[in-house]
Structures are given as C-alpha cells and as structure tokens.
Amino acid sequence: MKYKRIGAYLIDYFFISVLVIMFSQIKVINPYYDKYLDNYEVYQDVMDNTNVDNVSDIYKNQDYLISYQNVIKYGSFVSVMSMICYLLYFVGFQKWNKDQSLGKKIFGLKVVDKEEKSPSIYRYVLRTIFLYNLFVTILIIVLAFILSSKVFLISSIAINIIGYMFLYSNFLVFIFRKDSRAIHDIIAGTKVVEVENGNR
C-alpha cells in the first residue's frame, strides 16, 4: 500500500501545483504580480552578481535583504491562494468525494479516522496543514510583515530548515511504520486504507 500512497500523493501534488501556477499567472486575480516580478528581478541580480567564495556578503547587502523580504510579501497573495486551493481540494473536495482525492481514487485508497469512519473537517484541516507544510508558509508570511529584513532572513531560513526536517521525518515515519501512518496522520488521528473495488 505504501507505493499506492506515494503514487496518489504525486498525482494530487501535480494536479494542485498546476492549478495554483495557472491562477497565479493571471494578473487580474493577482494584483501584486508586477511588484513581485520587480522585486524578484532585484533579488536575482544580487544573487547573479555574488561571488560564490563570498556568499556571506549577500547577508550584508541591504538590496538583497529588502528584495528578499518583498518577494515574500508580494508573493504572499499567491501563497494564500495556494493554501486556499490546498484546503478546498484536500478538505472540501476529498470530504465530499467519499474521502478520496483524485490520486486516492485512482489507486483505490481513502482517508478514515481511527474508528474507520469519515474524518471530520477539523481532522482534514490538521492533516492538510501538516502533510503539505502549510504551517511553514503561514509562519513565514506573518513574519515577513512584522520583522526587520535581516531578522526575517535568518528566521525564514531557520523555519524552512525545520519545515524540511519535518517533511523528511514525516516520510521516514510513513516508510518504517507497519501501519503506514505518517506524522500528519498521527496528529490528525487519521489513516489511509484500501477500498474494495465495488466501493470506489
């Protein structure tokens, strides 16, 4: 079942990523698109003109610090829209679709709670937040608006490292547990089970 879950995850991730990319490119939907591109250009220029041997110099470069923070700020609209898409798909659609996302439907899987019943919306929200590291995105967006540029850079690096560590730990727990429950399943009180052919 582990391979089926990985396959379902990849299908769902691809589907939702394409959806988010499509929406984020529409200027009418994203009023900060041009400001994001302007700041990203400054950020990229600093990166391109930085000597690899003196990479620590970028942390002293005020243009880099400000442009990096602004990229996150003006990109927050897309990040929030992305989170809404994740929640609508993995909470709303999956709950409505008999606890199956498109990927799970294809591989004959579904999400249940510990009693093997349909999970509550609350459990689905918890599951999605931790499965897709949305807590990292939320925290970084909030900090981008309240911290100074230098403190924000250091904080965002630390938070991203924690996020990646959680992501890898989540995968390892899933691989080595006999019941195939990952950390997000344990936190949300859910598990993924195979569905009989007649009930797909």
Region spans (language model):
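Membrane-interfacial helix-loop-helix connectors in multipass membrane proteins
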Residues: 147-157
